[in-house]
Amino acid sequence: MTKSELIERLCAEQTHLSAKEVEDAVKDILEHMASTLESGDRIEIRGFGSFSLHYREPRVGRNPKTGDKVELEGKYVPHFKPGKELRERVNLG
């Protein structure tokens, strides 16, 4: 599901809200989540899961085109860990 598909589905379910209100709400939620992760904080949504940052150690990679070794710097990457309820729901469906 894309962001625009999510907005369309929410508009269909929440008929008392305008499409612009739904779009703004979705964009605000995603922006708040991104800025929370950017500041190094964790996001926990009970029953759904948690978002956090994991550190990837510096390593030696390869250029896929030439095969040359390339030094890759360490970096933080977003990580999602599904909650128990979400895992169970996915496994039943």
From Swiss-Prot:
GO biological process annotation, one example: DNA recombination
Similarity-based family: Belongs to the bacterial histone-like protein family.
Per UniProt, the keywords (alphabetical) are: DNA recombination, DNA-binding, Transcription, Transcription regulation, Translation regulation
Instruction: Report the protein name in the record.
Output: Integration host factor subunit beta
Q: What does this protein do?
A: This protein is one of the two subunits of integration host factor, a specific DNA-binding protein that functions in genetic recombination as well as in transcriptional and translational control.
PANTHER family in UniProt = DNA-BINDING PROTEIN HU (PTHR33175), INTEGRATION HOST FACTOR SUBUNIT BETA (PTHR33175:SF5)
Gene label: ihfB
In the record, what lineage is assigned to the organism producing the protein? Bacteria, Pseudomonadati, Pseudomonadota, Gammaproteobacteria, Vibrionales
Please give the subunit comment from the record: Heterodimer of an alpha and a beta chain.
Taxonomically, the superkingdom here is Bacteria
What GO cellular component is one of the record's annotations?
cytosol
GO MF terms, alphabetically ordered? DNA binding; structural constituent of chromatin
Q: Which InterPro entries does this one have?
A: Hist_DNA-bd, Histone-like_DNA-bd_CS, IHF-like_DNA-bd_dom_sf, IHF_beta
